[in-house]
Regions:
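Catalytic active-site module of serine/aspartate enzymes centered on a nucleophile-bearing elbow/loop
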Residues: 85-130
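Primarily recognizes the serine-hydrolase "nucleophile elbow" in alpha/beta-hydrolase
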Residues: 1-27
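Active-site-adjacent alpha-helix of alpha/beta-hydrolase-fold enzymes
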Residues: 30-92, 96-97, 101
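Residue-level preference for alpha-helix termini and adjacent loops
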Residues: 21, 30, 76-78, 110, ...
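Preference for short coil/turn "hinge" residues that link or interrupt alpha-helices
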Residues: 2, 67-70, 114-119
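Surface-exposed loop/turn and secondary-structure junction residues enriched for glycine/proline
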Residues: 12, 22, 49, 59, ...
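Residue-level recognition of the N-termini of beta-strands and the immediately preceding loop/turn
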Residues: 9-10, 66, 111
Length: 130
């Protein structure tokens, strides 16, 4: 893992990754870039409890500045949007706000200001509850 570190990377967004398959829980202490993890509440491919909620909780990742956003009712494939689709791209504002905040882009929308998601698809930062 140490050989993969790159000090230029300041922030990372991961959507529905299989955390337990890709990372050892003990490696969480060595992650310097801030992580925004997004998971759908109905993701059956990479379920949110074993692959997002539990790893974030067990490692104390929220106390280190990492965040977990759950998307209510979303499955593994509904978190993406393609050009020309009727469904708006909900992930864009969330990811942009996260990156703006971590990179301290002046005058830009921030993750902590909220406002991402919409009335049909709720996006909730559950990090403080872990």
């Amino acid at each position: 893992m140490a050989g993969l570190a790159d000090s230029r990377v300041k922030a990372v967004v991961a959507v529905s990754p299989p955390l337990r398959l890709l990372f050892e829980p003990s490696s969480a202490d060595r992650i310097e870039a801030k992580l925004l993890l997004v998971s759908g509440s109905r993701d059956w491919v990479v379920p949110s409890v074993p692959e997002a909620i539990r790893p974030m909780s067990e490692t104390g990742a929220a106390q280190k500045g990492h965040r977990l956003v759950l998307v209510d009712g979303a499955d593994h494939f509904s978190l993406r949007s393609f050009r020309g689709e009727a469904q708006p791209a909900l992930m864009g504002p969330l990811m942009l706000g996260w990156l703006n905040e971590q990179l301290q882009v002046p005058g830009s929308p921030r993750f902590s200001q909220g406002g991402w998601g919409d009335k049909q698809i709720q996006m909730v930062d559950v990090s403080e509850r872990l």
